[in-house]
């Protein structure tokens, strides 16, 4: 089957998005639907993955949605690019590590096309870059695999309010900074989503 590309122009409620993803997983499992790459944005939302620790909440007044993806606590909201993938790993030798590498390399390659030197870190998962020799996280990754079908995906901070990260220890990483592409490299990123889609499709078909 081919990969469907879906782009939402208005913010999508997080739980509504997860419901859609889970339904697509079931449809793919029955060979009733195509795989999916979905570009969207969420309203301001804190989510906690399966590795979540209560000590990562600094502001106890915030509402948190516990979710099935891997990883710890993070924030989603306006100005952030979300990319969800529903991909059948049965067709890819059930290699989760390779699939994660495809996602990471697609993000890095896409950012490189904007002149951004980005890299992954095996110890601290996500995509990083440097400004004035300081490491800063600009993309977070978290997936879930059910019946060897992967869903959830990643987020890239483009022009969002990073003060929300002060309420948590993002991804449980205490000694690193979180930033946005606009804060580090002030340029137009309107074509970034298209670049990511192109690179993901190319690498997923290899």
Where are these regions (language model features)?
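Solvent-exposed residues in well-ordered beta-strands and their adjoining turns
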Residues: 88-90, 144, 157-159, 199
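Short active-site-adjacent structural elements
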Residues: 48, 151-152, 165-167
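Conserved phosphate/anionic-ligand binding catalytic regions in large, soluble enzymes, centered on
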Residues: 149-159
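C-terminal accessory segment of soluble enzyme catalytic cores
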Residues: 128, 162-206
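N-terminal lobe of the biotin/lipoate ligase/transferase fold
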Residues: 1-138, 145, 190
